[in-house]
Amino acid sequence: MIRAAIVGATGYTGAELVRLLARHREVELVGLTSRQYADQPYANVYPHLSGQVDLACQSQDIDHITDMADVVFLALPHGLSVPWVAECVRKGKKVVDLGADFRLRRAAVYEQWYHVTHEAPELLAEAVYGLPELKREQIQKARIIANPGCYPTASLLSIAPLCGQGLIREDRLIIDAKSGVSGAGRNANLAIIYGEVNENVKAYNVAKHRHNPEIEQEVAERAGLDPDAMAITFTPHLMPMTRGILTTVYADLKEGVQPTSEEVRNLYRQFYAGEPFIHVMDEGVWPQTKWSYGSNHAYIGLTVEARTGRVIITTAIDNLVKGASGQAIQNMNILFGLPETTGIEAAGIYP
């Protein structure tokens, strides 16, 4: 059995990790930490997991947690993961960081967007960006997994098959993204209380969202471009729903390139052939967030708009599962040589 600990287990991504790992046949949960709920039974914090988890929340004792676990999941705000990652590396333990501290490979870019100094820039080069459909071989050999952000997951799955194919302007993408409120975390925040969110849709962090450089970094790598030359427009919106992300990517075709929708769809199906969680839809079938609710599955719809010379790609995922905790477990499965779908194979909850 793989002994797993979750640091920051009482936020939404931490709770989703607990829910999924509690029924993972190859995992034993050995530690759940929480600053707010230390010493309280976990099921008191999340009663829906009564009978599933009999552990109490612990304080964040870095030596104790890293000693007893084979893999440590970090579900912490940015700026807090570095000491945990450094200790896991020192002790030869695997670590999957669901935060932002190791996603960006250049410390200067991280510091520009997150406004904190990176305390272990020497570890950035070792961290593997954990999007399994794109980085599976690197993940297999990794010690540090930087679990992607929720918006970048959906955005990159949308555009990856077209990158480097000579078909589109990868540096000029436009990404419109919509997310459920759980993406904002579990905290007392006026912007996400019921009266503010219900029957309301709003854009936020326009032209300054921290997932923008993450998307640009990975698109540039796949397309063989300079990340500093990227000019991707990314605009997120908050939706009056609990879970789900829907991204729509607009990609300009290069001059003289005129593929049909069917040709592009075949390219996507070849690219994702054999991927258990990726589903490329038929022409005219557009993904819905309800399809992926509670699951690790991603649904992709696309068309070529010949009139404007663009490819339009829409992708739906669950922000807490494929966009966070499910993908983290998918990465763990790869790290330990397990079937990739173990513990996360279930379809979404519908309706």
From Swiss-Prot:
<dbReference type="GO" id="GO:0005737">
    <property type="term" value="C:cytoplasm"/>
</dbReference>
<keyword id="KW-0055">Arginine biosynthesis</keyword>
<keyword id="KW-0560">Oxidoreductase</keyword>
<dbReference type="GO" id="GO:0051287">
    <property type="term" value="F:NAD binding"/>
</dbReference>
<keyword id="KW-0521">NADP</keyword>
<comment type="pathway">
    <text>Amino-acid biosynthesis; L-arginine biosynthesis; N(2)-acetyl-L-ornithine from L-glutamate: step 3/4.</text>
</comment>
<comment type="function">
    <text>Catalyzes the NADPH-dependent reduction of N-acetyl-5-glutamyl phosphate to yield N-acetyl-L-glutamate 5-semialdehyde.</text>
</comment>
<feature type="active site">
    <location>
        <position position="150"/>
    </location>
</feature>
<keyword id="KW-0028">Amino-acid biosynthesis</keyword>
<dbReference type="Pfam" id="PF01118">
    <property type="entry name" value="Semialdhyde_dh"/>
</dbReference>
<keyword id="KW-0963">Cytoplasm</keyword>
<dbReference type="InterPro" id="IPR050085">
    <property type="entry name" value="NAGSA_dehydrogenase"/>
</dbReference>
<dbReference type="InterPro" id="IPR023013">
    <property type="entry name" value="AGPR_AS"/>
</dbReference>
<dbReference type="Pfam" id="PF22698">
    <property type="entry name" value="Semialdhyde_dhC_1"/>
</dbReference>
<dbReference type="GO" id="GO:0070401">
    <property type="term" value="F:NADP+ binding"/>
</dbReference>
<dbReference type="GO" id="GO:0003942">
    <property type="term" value="F:N-acetyl-gamma-glutamyl-phosphate reductase activity"/>
</dbReference>
<protein>
    <recommendedName>
        <fullName>N-acetyl-gamma-glutamyl-phosphate reductase</fullName>
        <ecNumber>1.2.1.38</ecNumber>
    </recommendedName>
</protein>
<comment type="similarity">
    <text>Belongs to the NAGSA dehydrogenase family. Type 1 subfamily.</text>
</comment>
<dbReference type="InterPro" id="IPR036291">
    <property type="entry name" value="NAD(P)-bd_dom_sf"/>
</dbReference>
<dbReference type="InterPro" id="IPR000534">
    <property type="entry name" value="Semialdehyde_DH_NAD-bd"/>
</dbReference>
<dbReference type="InterPro" id="IPR000706">
    <property type="entry name" value="AGPR_type-1"/>
</dbReference>
<dbReference type="GO" id="GO:0006526">
    <property type="term" value="P:L-arginine biosynthetic process"/>
</dbReference>
